[in-house]
């Protein structure tokens, strides 16, 4: 008879310890970039969807921006289309863009919307094309010191946040696919990390949370003792040139968000069930927190 009592007491302590964070975040917007392994494991997908519903029912306003790299790569392979990456970004030809557009909104976004809506009529899927949410501008990247064209890859030039604010006010959870036109109507694929940062800034979010496939930010990867729990934007800017190429878009996104007025950005391990709740509602958190200098 003692074990259930201990279990109940432990659960009560966990819930009670979350109270300060629930109060701090009540009524605030939290932008979550959903990607990596959390998008490919069925248990993690279900846990993430439940986390978003939990936030919503606690009076917090989650906005999900999702990637789809593994799914796009799988579809390109299935169709016999060559794929390439430069500087951490997918090289996007018109043919690749058609596949990305189909997979992001038609497959990945739909699946997440359905997982969330298994808990109630909450999620609404949108793309950067809807209500002119994003206006893109062509992006080049620097690879080994050389400016490199990566095709129809865009950065976010402008965010028209009104449509998402309307959804939030209606109690919905926006699920955003990052395809968007430029000023001339040419559609681009926007890196989901980049889009999440721009959206967090435009929405006046309290936090930007980035799911990854590592425990957080390592200052000297692969030395696992170099994991940092908190870092400011000044130190992070100095560290940026030394990072692995796959981490660069995520760290650039954190810097953009925090420099744009978002109080904190968080790089967390999406391979852990309920990682978003652990990061937001515990003192210890998980991963790396980025704050202003």
Swiss-Prot record:
A GO cellular component annotation in the UniProt record: cytoplasm
EC number in record: 2.7.2.8
Reactions it catalyzes: N-acetyl-L-glutamate + ATP = N-acetyl-L-glutamyl 5-phosphate + ADP
Binding-site residues, substrate: 68-69, 90, 189
Function statement: Catalyzes the ATP-dependent phosphorylation of N-acetyl-L-glutamate.
Similarity-based family: Belongs to the acetylglutamate kinase family. ArgB subfamily.
Site (Transition state stabilizer): 33, 250
Pathway(s) this gene product operates in, as recorded in its UniProt entry: Amino-acid biosynthesis; L-arginine biosynthesis; N(2)-acetyl-L-ornithine from L-glutamate: step 2/4
Swiss-Prot/TrEMBL keywords: Amino-acid biosynthesis, Arginine biosynthesis, ATP-binding, Cytoplasm, Kinase, Nucleotide-binding, Transferase
UniProt GO MF annotations: acetylglutamate kinase activity; ATP binding
Name assigned to this protein: Acetylglutamate kinase
GO BP annotations, alphabetical order: arginine biosynthetic process via ornithine; L-arginine biosynthetic process
CDD domains (UniProt xref): AAK_NAGK-C
Major enzyme class: transferase
UniProt xrefs under NCBIfam families: argB
UniProt subcellular location: Cytoplasm
InterPro entries noted in UniProt: AceGlu_kinase-like_sf, AcgluKinase_fam, ArgB, Asp/Glu/Uridylate_kinase, Glu/AcGlu_kinase, NAGK-C
């Amino acid at each position: 008879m003692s074990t259930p009592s201990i279990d109940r007491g432990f659960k009560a302590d966990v819930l009670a310890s979350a109270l300060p964070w629930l109060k701090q975040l009540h009524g605030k917007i939290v932008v979550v970039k959903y990607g990596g392994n959390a998008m490919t494991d069925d248990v993690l997908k279900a846990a993430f969807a439940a986390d978003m519903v939990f936030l919503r029912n606690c009076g917090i306003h989650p906005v999900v921006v999702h990637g789809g790299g593994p799914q796009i790569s799988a579809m390109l392979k299935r169709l016999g289309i060559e794929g390439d990456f430069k500087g951490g970004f997918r090289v996007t030809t018109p043919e690749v863009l058609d596949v990305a557009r189909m997979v992001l909104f038609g497959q990945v976004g739909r699946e997440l919307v359905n997982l969330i809506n298994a808990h109630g009529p909450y999620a609404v899927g949108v793309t950067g094309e809807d209500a002119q949410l994003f206006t893109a501008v062509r992006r080049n990247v620097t690879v080994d010191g050389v400016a490199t064209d990566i095709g129809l890859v865009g950065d976010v030039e402008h965010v028209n946040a009104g449509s998402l604010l309307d959804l939030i006010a209606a109690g919905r959870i926006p699920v955003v696919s990052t395809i968007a036109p430029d000023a001339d109507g040419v559609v681009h694929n926007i890196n989901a990390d980049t889009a999440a940062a721009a959206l967090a800034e435009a929405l006046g979010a309290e936090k930007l949370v980035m799911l990854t496939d590592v425990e957080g930010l390592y200052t000297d990867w692969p030395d696992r003792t170099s994991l940092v729990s908190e870092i400011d934007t000044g130190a992070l800017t100095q560290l940026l040139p030394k990072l692995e190429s796959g981490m660069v878009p995520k760290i650039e996104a954190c810097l953009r968000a925090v420099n744009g007025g978002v109080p904190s950005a968080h790089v967390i391990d999406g391979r852990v069930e309920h990682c978003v709740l652990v990061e937001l509602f515990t003192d210890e958190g998980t991963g790396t927190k980025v704050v202003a200098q």
